Swiss-Prot record:
Source organism per UniProt: Rhodopseudomonas palustris (strain TIE-1)
Catalytic reactions of this protein: UDP-N-acetyl-alpha-D-muramate + L-alanine + ATP = UDP-N-acetyl-alpha-D-muramoyl-L-alanine + ADP + phosphate + H(+)
Keyword Cell division: yes
Molecular functions per Gene Ontology: ATP binding; UDP-N-acetylmuramate-L-alanine ligase activity
EC number: 6.3.2.8
HAMAP family linked: MurC
Name of the featured protein: UDP-N-acetylmuramate--L-alanine ligase
UniProt cross-references to NCBIfam families, sorted A to Z: murC
Family: Belongs to the MurCDEF family.
Residues annotated as binding ATP: 114-120
């Protein structure tokens, strides 16, 4: 039995969240009655309102009046008044992943998981399938520039979704094709141990039906180990590793992007195939690897080499993934969501490959607990930055941890050999600090999952105001 068409209204608590908003938008486009609430106004809230969705700002019991079902994410606390009211009224309460799973049952699905690179890879798979006239439905964890939204309802048989592993609920998603980009120690507040994280990814792949397949990056040692443990499922490996079934070759930086080729090897059939002259308008090895995963899926689904080439060359990117926000006196300002040491290192390496000038990193650490648990990694991931400007920790709802703050991080970076580290007093001071450091040809890269994105977009104008 599938989600009945007559059910509704469907009420989303926290509808403005990037994961919740995409599901709400697709349900609305399918004809379901959708409503919701969020703690504050936002671009996502405004976009959904424009589609006719009623949204309350603030959470209170009266907001759920008339609802047939309540959808919540793990960010919603157990004492939320709307959640309490729904349970008191015996209204069914479902998790975000459960509702996403219901949508996935309507289509054949590609689900993209991994500690890093999910959003970009999801966008690339969507772009390639779209170019191949498969007209996919898409639910992503970031705004796809080509769509201006993180979700779209397609008319084809395929759906492409980002599978968020943070709370383990990605195991509920019925994927026909699974991508695993990498697996690092993250979300240990939920999983407790890294072994549990790895077990979850193994189960995610083994949940794929016998007629499906998984695409896994064996450049990552943990993923390579997982490949050896998974039985009775078809796996296509990818990466620069010579053992990869889809091997990334001849990667080179070119005009702010990358060029490369992908060589396929079918061990069972004993055949080989190569797609050459691939161009991606994004820099960085990490983005080329993400593209290789998407190419592997597209190739397996029968898209022509020429379609893949054209779609990749036209890829418009994802908001907050190496997004240029403006220029000032020849200085390029970049906004990026990177907030884990692995992501930060990859973004800064891409910036280094994109300019002969200096790379100036502006970082807003995200969560005290993450900075504490990965402190050594944070202190060693800025090697490609000539200067590091450190803002206060963005708490994301966490209470401060004694000794884990901006100044402690600054001292840690200096102790690890960074010679030019600046403690940022506040966002209003950023333009003045950057103006004193940057010259024509330099890149200023703003990094973090908090409100630093607003600083990145304001910075070009603030710098121009200084003269």
């Amino acid at each position: 039995m599938r989600l009945p068409r007559h059910i509704g209204p469907i009420h989303f608590v926290g509808i403005g969240g990037i994961g919740m908003s995409g599901i709400a938008e697709v349900l609305c486009n399918l004809g379901y009655t959708v409503q919701g609430s969020d703690a504050s106004e936002s671009a996502n809230v405004n976009r959904l309102r424009e589609k006719g969705i009623q949204i309350h700002v603030g959470h209170q019991a009266d907001n759920i009046k008339g609802a047939d079902v309540l959808v919540v994410s793990t960010a919603i606390k157990r004492d939320n008044p709307e959640l309490l009211a729904a349970r008191a009224q015996r209204i069914p309460v479902v998790r975000r992943a459960e509702m996403l799973a219901e949508l996935m049952r309507l289509k054949s699905c590609v689900a993209i998981a991994g500690t890093h690179g999910k959003t970009t890879t999801t966008s690339m798979v969507a772009a390639l399938l779209d170019a191949g006239d498969l007209d996919p439905t898409v639910i992503n964890g970031g705004i796809i520039n080509a769509y201006g939204t993180n979700a779209r309802l397609g008319g084809g048989d395929w759906m492409v979704v980002e599978a968020d592993e943070s709370d383990g609920t990605f195991l509920k998603l019925p994927a026909d094709v699974a991508i695993v980009t990498n697996v690092d120690p993250e979300h240990l507040d939920h999983f407790k141990t890294f072994d549990a994280v790895q077990d979850a990814f193994r189960n995610f792949v083994e949940n794929v039906p016998f007629y499906g397949f998984a695409v896994m990056c064996i450049d990552h040692p943990v993923v390579q180990t997982l490949v050896g443990k998974i039985e009775d499922r078809r796996i296509i490996t990818y990466g620069e590793n010579p053992q990869a079934d889809a091997r990334l070759l001849d990667l080179a930086a070119s005009g702010g992007g990358s060029t490369f080729k992908v060589a396929f090897r079918d061990r069972k059939a004993g055949t080989a195939h190569e797609i050459a002259d691939l161009k991606l308008p994004m820099p960085g090895r990490h983005n080329a690897l993400n593209a290789t995963a998407a190419i592997a899926v597209a190739h397996e689904l029968g898209l022509s080499d020429d379609t893949i080439r054209k779609a990749l060359a036209a890829f418009g990117g994802v908001r907050r993934r190496f997004t240029k926000t403006g220029e000032w006196n020849g200085v390029t300002i970049i906004d990026d969501y990177g907030h884990h040491p692995v992501e930060i290192a990859a973004v800064l390496k891409a910036a280094r490959q994109s300019t002969s000038g200096k790379v100036i990193a502006v970082v807003q650490p995200h969560r005290f607990s993450r900075l504490q648990s990965l402190f050594e990694e944070f202190c060693t991931c800025f090697n490609d930055a000539d200067a590091v400007i450190v803002a206060d920790v963005y708490p994301a709802g966490e209470a401060p941890i004694e000794g884990i703050d901006r100044d402690h991080f600054v001292l840690g970076l200096r102790a690890h050999g960074h010679r030019d580290v600046v403690a940022l007093q506040d966002s209003a001071s950023l333009a003045g600090v950057v103006a004193g450091l940057a010259h024509s040809g330099d890149y200023v890269v703003c990094l973090g999952a908090g409100n630093i994105t607003q600083w990145a977009y304001a910075l070009p104008g603030e710098l121009k105001a200084l003269g």
